[in-house]
């Protein structure tokens, strides 16, 4: 049984509605030392918005500032500034009760060089509307309460700080890893879908078997109307998630754990069934069950549970999330069937519009000027929980000083794998039915080219990109050109039929084509 058999449509749509991941906060180093004692120093991680302020890239170029502890005052009024003043100092305040921008304006008016907000959350506050903070020039950064307490205990009260943001190499190896994962997943998922198609064609021996198989497959088939309804549900779900994030994020985590553990089981059990060893069985409820599958189910559940418990552990939890995510994408590509190219165009086209709208258009609608997709990626309302709908690959610490910060990661949304993967899976099934491999190979290459274009734009624009904006045109245009050049567009558009073939004799299919739509009508 596939994933769609086990999850209700709203739950599946909720998981689908957030399949795009974007980057969030900028990390920097706060180098603290005791005045007059250069040997006594310590580095801490701080978070800032590089759209507001630029920091030097090295400690040598950073400016020394005397640190002033103002956590005992709210700094919400000019009267909160101490008599000695705060000119050319870095002041530390607690979060609240007034808005952090109000604190920044007061600190700036008092001549402070930087405002450090000691907060339990390490998330930098969202930038809001640009007109709100355009007159604020003082550096605003966030440090954790734990780090500030350690700073006072280690270095005392007379502290000097330097702030800088080490630059990363121009070449980001994590993009290569993500590229390999994405192309491998869509290629394997599409090929697996073709293998299932081939097995179905070989197993059909009479009309009764054919009718039984068609009824089973129709449960997983997305008609054009179903595709439209599904995308509408996705839009509704992402809006609900935006307004009720603090509650629904845990629903998403629960759905991901259940769906990904089942997907991992489906992927690994397919390998176990083909292994000559491990065939021992036990009788349970009148059925013979392989002992190896019992252990496998326990392993898959354990992986999901361990990830759920340690999901916020930056050092290694990403490995489990990526394993579960790859299995989830593979299972979904293999399970969901688009019956024809028309359904593929509708699904990919609507999700492309969906992607662009929630990334580029919603900033003109929301009150804070941020896109809904960016807010969900960062966690609205400074929520530390993240949606588990991305492939994450951390950057190796090329600079040891950056080890004090959480590991920076590159991400790719599951939707950027699954959505084009469904098209590639259809191309592979069509190839199996027509005795070729041209559609599968060309669509996979087109996906790889689209990913490369996405990464090039990412490096040029220096900001997160909706990958479907480049993947959808690359894949759809490529397979359309192939279909037109082979004079198979009509057949490719409507979908090829299943035929009862001896030794894969495809000439019957050419002489008596029956479209998938006609199959549905006949039922």
From Swiss-Prot:
<dbReference type="GO" id="GO:0042803">
    <property type="term" value="F:protein homodimerization activity"/>
</dbReference>
<keyword id="KW-0458">Lysosome</keyword>
<dbReference type="InterPro" id="IPR046450">
    <property type="entry name" value="PA_dom_sf"/>
</dbReference>
<dbReference type="InterPro" id="IPR007369">
    <property type="entry name" value="Peptidase_A22B_SPP"/>
</dbReference>
<keyword id="KW-0645">Protease</keyword>
<feature type="transmembrane region" description="Helical">
    <location>
        <begin position="225"/>
        <end position="245"/>
    </location>
</feature>
<feature type="glycosylation site" description="N-linked (GlcNAc...) asparagine">
    <location>
        <position position="119"/>
    </location>
</feature>
<dbReference type="GO" id="GO:0042500">
    <property type="term" value="F:aspartic endopeptidase activity, intramembrane cleaving"/>
</dbReference>
<dbReference type="GO" id="GO:0005765">
    <property type="term" value="C:lysosomal membrane"/>
</dbReference>
<dbReference type="GO" id="GO:0033619">
    <property type="term" value="P:membrane protein proteolysis"/>
</dbReference>
<dbReference type="GO" id="GO:0031902">
    <property type="term" value="C:late endosome membrane"/>
</dbReference>
<feature type="topological domain" description="Cytoplasmic">
    <location>
        <begin position="337"/>
        <end position="344"/>
    </location>
</feature>
<keyword id="KW-1133">Transmembrane helix</keyword>
<dbReference type="Pfam" id="PF02225">
    <property type="entry name" value="PA"/>
</dbReference>
<feature type="topological domain" description="Lumenal">
    <location>
        <begin position="26"/>
        <end position="175"/>
    </location>
</feature>
<keyword id="KW-0967">Endosome</keyword>
<feature type="topological domain" description="Cytoplasmic">
    <location>
        <begin position="485"/>
        <end position="523"/>
    </location>
</feature>
<feature type="transmembrane region" description="Helical">
    <location>
        <begin position="404"/>
        <end position="424"/>
    </location>
</feature>
<feature type="glycosylation site" description="N-linked (GlcNAc...) asparagine">
    <location>
        <position position="129"/>
    </location>
</feature>
<feature type="active site">
    <location>
        <position position="355"/>
    </location>
</feature>
<feature type="glycosylation site" description="N-linked (GlcNAc...) asparagine">
    <location>
        <position position="69"/>
    </location>
</feature>
<dbReference type="InterPro" id="IPR006639">
    <property type="entry name" value="Preselin/SPP"/>
</dbReference>
<feature type="topological domain" description="Cytoplasmic">
    <location>
        <begin position="425"/>
        <end position="440"/>
    </location>
</feature>
<feature type="topological domain" description="Lumenal">
    <location>
        <begin position="246"/>
        <end position="247"/>
    </location>
</feature>
<dbReference type="InterPro" id="IPR003137">
    <property type="entry name" value="PA_domain"/>
</dbReference>
<feature type="glycosylation site" description="N-linked (GlcNAc...) asparagine">
    <location>
        <position position="61"/>
    </location>
</feature>
<feature type="topological domain" description="Lumenal">
    <location>
        <begin position="310"/>
        <end position="315"/>
    </location>
</feature>
<feature type="transmembrane region" description="Helical">
    <location>
        <begin position="345"/>
        <end position="365"/>
    </location>
</feature>
<feature type="topological domain" description="Cytoplasmic">
    <location>
        <begin position="197"/>
        <end position="224"/>
    </location>
</feature>
<keyword id="KW-0812">Transmembrane</keyword>
<feature type="topological domain" description="Lumenal">
    <location>
        <begin position="462"/>
        <end position="463"/>
    </location>
</feature>
<feature type="signal peptide">
    <location>
        <begin position="1"/>
        <end position="25"/>
    </location>
</feature>
<dbReference type="GO" id="GO:0030660">
    <property type="term" value="C:Golgi-associated vesicle membrane"/>
</dbReference>
<feature type="glycosylation site" description="N-linked (GlcNAc...) asparagine">
    <location>
        <position position="135"/>
    </location>
</feature>
<keyword id="KW-0325">Glycoprotein</keyword>
<comment type="function">
    <text>Intramembrane-cleaving aspartic protease (I-CLiP) that cleaves type II membrane signal peptides in the hydrophobic plane of the membrane. Functions in FASLG, ITM2B and TNF processing. Catalyzes the intramembrane cleavage of the anchored fragment of shed TNF-alpha (TNF), which promotes the release of the intracellular domain (ICD) for signaling to the nucleus. Also responsible for the intramembrane cleavage of Fas antigen ligand FASLG, which promotes the release of the intracellular FasL domain (FasL ICD).</text>
</comment>
<feature type="domain" description="PA">
    <location>
        <begin position="70"/>
        <end position="155"/>
    </location>
</feature>
<comment type="subunit">
    <text>Interacts with ITM2B.</text>
</comment>
<feature type="transmembrane region" description="Helical">
    <location>
        <begin position="464"/>
        <end position="484"/>
    </location>
</feature>
<feature type="transmembrane region" description="Helical">
    <location>
        <begin position="316"/>
        <end position="336"/>
    </location>
</feature>
<feature type="transmembrane region" description="Helical">
    <location>
        <begin position="176"/>
        <end position="196"/>
    </location>
</feature>
<feature type="topological domain" description="Cytoplasmic">
    <location>
        <begin position="269"/>
        <end position="288"/>
    </location>
</feature>
């Amino acid at each position: 049984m596939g994933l769609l058999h086990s999850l209700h449509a709203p739950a599946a749509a909720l998981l689908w509605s957030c399949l795009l991941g974007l980057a969030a906060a900028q990390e920097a180093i706060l180098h603290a030392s005791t005045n007059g004692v250069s040997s006594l120093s310590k580095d801490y991680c701080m978070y800032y918005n590089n759209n507001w302020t630029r920091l030097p890239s090295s400690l040598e170029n950073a400016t020394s500032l005397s640190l002033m502890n103002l956590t005992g005052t709210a700094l919400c009024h000019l009267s909160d500034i101490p008599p000695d003043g705060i000119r050319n100092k870095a002041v530390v305040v607690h979060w609240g009760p007034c808005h952090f921008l109000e604190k920044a304006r007061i600190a700036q008016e008092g001549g402070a060089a930087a405002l450090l907000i000691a907060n339990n959350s390490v998330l930098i506050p969202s930038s809001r509307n640009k007109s709100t903070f355009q007159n604020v020039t003082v550096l605003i950064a966030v440090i954790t309460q734990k780090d500030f307490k350690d700073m006072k205990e280690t270095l005392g009260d007379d502290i000097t700080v330097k702030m800088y943001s080490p630059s990363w190499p121009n070449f980001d190896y994590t993009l290569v890893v993500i590229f390999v994962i994405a192309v491998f997943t869509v290629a394997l998922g599409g090929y697996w879908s073709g293998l299932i198609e081939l097995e179905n064609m070989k197993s059909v021996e009479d009309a009764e078997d054919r009718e039984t198989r068609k009824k089973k497959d129709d449960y997983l088939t997305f008609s054009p109307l179903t595709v439209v309804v599904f995308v509408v549900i996705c839009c509704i779900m992402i809006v609900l998630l935006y307004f009720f994030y603090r509650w629904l994020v845990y629903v998403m985590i629960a759905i991901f754990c259940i769906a990904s553990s089942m997907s991992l089981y489906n992927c690994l059990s397919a390998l176990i069934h083909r292994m000559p060893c491990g065939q021992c069985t036990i009788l349970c409820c009148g059925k013979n069950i392989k002992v190896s599958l019992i252990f496998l189910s326990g392993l898959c559940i354990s992986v999901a549970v361990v990830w759920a418990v340690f999901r916020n552990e930056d050092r290694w939890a990403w490995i489990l999330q990526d394993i579960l995510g790859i299995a989830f994408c593979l299972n979904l590509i293999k399970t969901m069937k688009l019956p024809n190219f028309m359904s593929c165009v509708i699904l990919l086209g609507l999700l492309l519009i969906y992607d662009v709208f929630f990334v580029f258009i919603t900033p003109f609608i929301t009150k804070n000027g941020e896109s809904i997709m960016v807010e969900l990626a960062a966690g609205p309302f400074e929520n530390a929980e993240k949606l588990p709908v991305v492939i994450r690959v951390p950057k190796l610490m090329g600079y040891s000083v950056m080890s004090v910060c959480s590991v920076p990661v590159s991400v790719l949304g599951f939707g950027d794998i699954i959505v084009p993967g469904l098209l590639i899976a259809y191309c592979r099934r069509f190839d199996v039915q027509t005795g070729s491999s041209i559609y599968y190979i060309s669509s996979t290459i087109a996906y790889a080219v689209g990913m490369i274009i996405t990464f090039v734009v990412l490096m040029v624009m220096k900001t997160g990109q909706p990958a479907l904006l480049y993947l959808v045109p690359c894949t759809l245009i490529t397979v359309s050109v192939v279909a037109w050049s082979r004079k198979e567009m009509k057949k490719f558009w409507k979908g090829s039929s299943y035929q009862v073939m001896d030794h894969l004799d495809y000439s019957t299919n050419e002489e008596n084509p029956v479209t998938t739509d006609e199959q549905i009508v006949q039922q």
